[in-house]
Amino acid sequence: MSRSLLLWFLLFLLLLPPLPVLLADPGAPTPVNPCCYYPCQHQGICVRFGLDRYQCDCTRTGYSGPNCTIPGLWTWLRNSLRPSPSFTHFLLTHGRWFWEFVNATFIREMLMRLVLTVRSNLIPSPPTYNSAHDYISWESFSNVSYYTRILPSVPKDCPTPMGTKGKKQLPDAQLLARRFLLRRKFIPDPQGTNLMFAFFAQHFTHQFFKTSGKMGPGFTKALGHGVDLGHIYGDNLERQYQLRLFKDGKLKYQVLDGEMYPPSVEEAPVLMHYPRGIPPQSQMAVGQEVFGLLPGLMLYATLWLREHNRVCDLLKAEHPTWGDEQLFQTTRLILIGETIKIVIEEYVQQLSGYFLQLKFDPELLFGVQFQYRNRIAMEFNHLYHWHPLMPDSFKVGSQEYSYEQFLFNTSMLVDYGVEALVDAFSRQIAGRIGGGRNMDHHILHVAVDVIRESREMRLQPFNEYRKRFGMKPYTSFQELVGEKEMAAELEELYGDIDALEFYPGLLLEKCHPNSIFGESMIEIGAPFSLKGLLGNPICSPEYWKPSTFGGEVGFNIVKTATLKKLVCLNTKTCPYVSFRVPDASQDDGPAVERPSTEL
């Protein structure tokens, strides 16, 4: 009986009409992607599950807990002993007599090794994300056409452009630039950085910052992703072959007024970006197509051309049996080494303002875990837009040139000569980068483009990058900028300090005392820079040996390279050359001295 009733009951259920599908109430709020809140701390990775759940992957962060906030014992101990970035900067920029002692002892190498490892470890290797993939993927690793990303993009379905904080619409980029970045009055760099430095920065970085106009802002044409001197030799083999002489390893050149200069486009038919109306014989052909824009860029192109051909002569004398290809390739490696040496020991030294004397010695890292590979990050590209360095006008000798007179000036380099331009650029002070309101109106559009590009690529807020690089997030705009008026304006536009964008945050942050920029530019920029420099193959144990550079002669050129040698071994007279303007007591006007003949 009971079995019969059960069968009738089951049959009744089968005959019932299906339950209607209940649609969500149109007025009910859509669940917010929990990763929009950036809940995972200390480099934990947010993974979304379902609609409103997430999980933080805290693997190897040193932290545990739902949001990676509970430190392990060793992590807690390390954090307790680690000085703050501001305190570290204070120590390194004070007490000159103490650092003179340190620089003369083995302690210098110990500290340099510590600096290199701590900074480099902040950069993920292999690379993690790119503009198309906000998660680990094979494409992010293998496709070198992309810039890598340190942090994934802001999720597309967040309530606000920067996640959950701030206003529904970001302030107009043009308005931001005019209010906070446009120069009112030229602010010189308190560290004494000069235009020789500014043009070196532009020339040097254009070998690896080459956003692809055809593919879009997330892509790069500089597939070497590091110091490969593509701006000297070209970023592809076809361009390189057009620039080479194919004799004794040398590059093509022309002689004007008894001096060596890059060849004309007529002699080396490569694409160069010059205004219409400039004939091919007046256009100089070099590795980077935009270097005709500024005489300062073509000045460095000329110096490195002369250096390449000079080193070829030295190697030819050492190795008379070598052919053109081996002379060319070995000279290229030597110039890569010279570049890295100058960048670390003079360029980065000037930027840092440290009394600790930085040292380029790849052997410092031979005993530690280190990957000799690099990938340029989009954040590094944005960070490096240091256009406040540029002055209101350019002074050469007794003449002063406006931007209209200076840009695409194809005759200045030859008319004045290398020595005169080096002397002039070394004596003219550059602008302060940080602190805001110091960008000339002629180049303000570049900052506007960077801000717009960062929005298209959905870069995370400035405070998230501070946390990623071991700094505390700012709690207010006044804490960021150090003054009330600008802070109030930023508050009005953004609504929340946690909604401030990456590039404006870097340029508006208050500077360290007597410094060219603030804490974040140093703490974020230094890891990218040092990892890129020391991650070069020539710094690896397999490459860093005399035979790589043609013997002790070539190896010695690398190990003793300086900016002064780059100039003075390739000019008839030796002008004042430095990345810093001369002290007032030394600045007695243009003067030259006989060049040194040592290697």
Curated annotation (Swiss-Prot):
The cofactor remark states: Binds 1 heme b (iron(II)-protoporphyrin IX) group per subunit.
Subcellular localization, as worded in the UniProt entry: Microsome membrane; Endoplasmic reticulum membrane
Question: Which catalytic reaction applies to this protein?
Answer: (5Z,8Z,11Z,14Z)-eicosatetraenoate + AH2 + 2 O2 = prostaglandin H2 + A + H2O; (5Z,8Z,11Z,14Z)-eicosatetraenoate + 2 O2 = prostaglandin G2; prostaglandin G2 + AH2 = prostaglandin H2 + A + H2O; (9Z,12Z)-octadecadienoate + AH2 + O2 = (9R)-hydroxy-(10E,12Z)-octadecadienoate + A + H2O
Q: Where is the signal peptide?
A: 1-23
Active site residues of this protein: H206, Y384
Q: What role does it play?
A: Dual cyclooxygenase and peroxidase that plays an important role in the biosynthesis pathway of prostanoids, a class of C20 oxylipins mainly derived from arachidonate ((5Z,8Z,11Z,14Z)-eicosatetraenoate, AA, C20:4(n-6)), with a particular role in the inflammatory response. The cyclooxygenase activity oxygenates AA to the hydroperoxy endoperoxide prostaglandin G2 (PGG2), and the peroxidase activity reduces PGG2 to the hydroxy endoperoxide prostaglandin H2 (PGH2), the precursor of all 2-series prostaglandins and thromboxanes.
Supply the name of the protein: Prostaglandin G/H synthase 1
Source species of the chain:
Homo sapiens (Human)
Question: What is the primary gene name for this protein?
Answer: PTGS1
